[in-house]
């Protein structure tokens, strides 16, 4: 079926669903569909509430919610960086709601006004094809500057800041590590090695896995998924520092199934949900302090992380995206 036609039909179904049954929920997911479908299926299994959802990148989801705020088409949003929610809060997109049993989630991983709740932590990382490294007698990148190596020319893929929260997270990282002006100068140099900017954050991961390009910058959840499938890749973190995203969820203001939306957010903030993502290798670091992951690559204490305030990210998103357009890719 034509993708555009399919999307229209699903959107119609989402609209209709709110009028058909109180036991249904309409959602946008920024989280990749392969994870969202499993999560929503588990929620339905636990509650009996059917979920109709569409998947978009963070920029696309934010644009749709902003356009639809007078007549919301969904009740809840799953996933995506908390900065996306922060950017939309001032436009009245989200409804304040603190989920039940959320005390086990540290306050820095929840919005102080309860407009979003963190359900996972995801640092950025480098994902690199090991066959490319061996062929070129190279080591995997361990610092941001390593990506400027001329052997990477036309061999890097990473996300487009106009559509992807992964890309804006990359900008925030660089600004915190290098300073604002130096970060944009670095990205201009880096642009010379870029093969393609992808619409979604995970878009370049499979081309790296299959050797169509060499390396890129991704959230760990996307990079680790590729590694766990057995592709010839290695994952490394920038020693000079990297920020992390807070994967969030929140109730959409004015949604037709408000009670069900709150029930979903309660469930997503629960210990049961955190245990579910760990058991099913949905590779977010749980935000709850009472659930741990045993995968050493997800041990945040071993990574040089730079904490970036979520509210600041929301304030800077448009400014930095426009600056990236003007100074980096033009």
What is each of the regions a protein language model found here?
Residues 30-31, 36, 73-212:
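Extracytoplasmic ligand-binding site segments that recognize negatively charged/polar headgroups
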Residues 252-308:
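Mature extracytoplasmic/periplasmic domains
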Residues 16-22:
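Sec/Tat signal peptide C-region and signal peptidase I cleavage site
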